[in-house]
Amino acid sequence: MMIKRSITTNMKALRLIQPHLLKTGSLRTDLLCTISSFFSSCERDFSSISNGNVCFRERLRSGIVDIKKDDAIALFQEMIRSRPLPSLVDFSRFFSAIARTKQFNLVLDFCKQLELNGIAHNIYTLNIMINCFCRCCKTCFAYSVLGKVMKLGYEPDTTTFNTLIKGLFLEGKVSEAVVLVDRMVENGCQPDVVTYNSIVNGICRSGDTSLALDLLRKMEERNVKADVFTYSTIIDSLCRDGCIDAAISLFKEMETKGIKSSVVTYNSLVRGLCKAGKWNDGALLLKDMVSREIVPNVITFNVLLDVFVKEGKLQEANELYKEMITRGISPNIITYNTLMDGYCMQNRLSEANNMLDLMVRNKCSPDIVTFTSLIKGYCMVKRVDDGMKVFRNISKRGLVANAVTYSILVQGFCQSGKIKLAEELFQEMVSHGVLPDVMTYGILLDGLCDNGKLEKALEIFEDLQKSKMDLGIVMYTTIIEGMCKGGKVEDAWNLFCSLPCKGVKPNVMTYTVMISGLCKKGSLSEANILLRKMEEDGNAPNDCTYNTLIRAHLRDGDLTASAKLIEEMKSCGFSADASSIKMVIDMLLSGELDKSFLDMLS
């Protein structure tokens, strides 16, 4: 009745202003738009009574999954136009559904429109806003909504705080998240296990396992019972830190408290034990897992396969793979990639290709890691052309080569002496928008130096120094070695001496390379001084360092210095390498040394 009265009034008003609107052409257009809009609104007013509420409520009841932006906007407009207005429960349900599709900014726009239409928020819609701001990494705005929550007289609940904590971790604000938990307690809002699990997970991801353990003890003090997720997260973090004993201790504590372990807990422990070389303990734990009727999953087997492959135990890996199939567990891309990498590392390329065929037959699509492993395998046996054929087929499968793929092939060409092809591939990499990293540049510079293109290497190195790329000691060592081999020992020495000013600390390899350069130049006294400086700087010489100096002194005819260095080398647990032994034998045969020197060397 009210709507009809409103329409009658509006019609009278329209008749009164009609003569004025028709005076100009532009206003005639406005009139047509106005009339059209007017009757559309009338139609909507009537339709909303009969169909509107039924329509959107039916949509909400049936569930909104993967709704597109335009459809969401249309549905929201329908809700806003409906009379009577939908309840805040309906709006909350709608906003939550849109948020689940990760259209967070759209939800925030809807919330703003809700306010503009004079519809007040409740704690549920405000919590949804906080969640959306947090998921967009805008916790500062989320805090402003929290202020609104309090201003409206609502009490922030654990959902509010849990959401804020997750948002802080998304932005890497670990300390702020921990402080927020304490603030919750101070404000009389008791954090629940979900709150603590969010904090523990975030802290462990940031690498601060000790802080996670402290938080576990705080949970006990505050009478919040930790669950399997809490313990499993910390156990996994301890295993990744190499603290296996502490992880086992926490595992036993968990069992004592009656918290049943999950397959995730066992997976972490098995991985940790195997990586620490405790094979028997890992096997026993696996048996314990099965005896407790906790079924190993594909991750369990992948963990064990990875360890076997990295240890070079490919036979054991194959047996484990067969066991996996027997148990009815389907291999995934990680399983196949791990085994393929193992075959390639042992130059068993035929078996690697068979595994590739098998994964395709089993409807498991190879990824870039799969083909990169195969390319690496070909390059390792100097079959870089075959590796290149695999590389050219990658794009046909809809895959894009990454920096690792290109780097492996560039290295393959460099090691095969095909430096021109290496340079061409490097240029192709850049032209295809794949940014070379430090590893790629290091490989290229090393290849250029080894293939007599020092000047080209220095040109690239100079450009890199001007860039913002963190070159690292490996890159500098490569160039210093290239300079020394190319007869630019003075330049190498100047670069070596400038390293501290660049904030780069020389390592054992850097010192050894520089000592070798000084020896080739005949500057043995400087090489000896650098040996002692190396020790003072906390870099203990290795077998390569000693053998380099021993051979230099032998060439110089200083047998006394050579003998002293041999004794020092042996006392450090090192022995002569093949080059040193050959030199001594040659000098022995030519009469420059007696047999006692060879005895001392062995």
Swiss-Prot record:
Stretches assigned to coiled coil: none
Transit peptide residue numbers: 1-95
Domain of life: Eukaryota
Main location: mitochondrion
Protein's name according to its UniProt entry: Putative pentatricopeptide repeat-containing protein At1g12700, mitochondrial
A GO term from the CC aspect: mitochondrion
InterPro entries named in the record: Pentatricopeptide_rpt, PPR-containing_protein, TPR-like_helical_dom_sf
Family: Belongs to the PPR family. P subfamily.
PPR repeat segments: 87-121, 122-156, 157-191, 192-226, 227-261, 262-296, 297-331, 332-366, 367-401, 402-436, 437-471, 472-506, 507-541, 542-576
GO biological process, one term: mitochondrial mRNA 5'-end processing
Entries under PANTHER family matching the protein: MEMBRANE-ASSOCIATED SALT-INDUCIBLE PROTEIN-LIKE, OS03G0201400 PROTEIN
Record key words, sorted: Mitochondrion, Repeat, Transit peptide
Organism: Arabidopsis thaliana (Mouse-ear cress)
Disulfide bonds listed in the record: none
Pfam families linked to this entry: PPR_1, PPR_2
Subcellular location: Mitochondrion
Gene3D superfamilies linked to this entry: Tetratricopeptide repeat domain
Keyword Transit peptide among UniProt keywords: yes
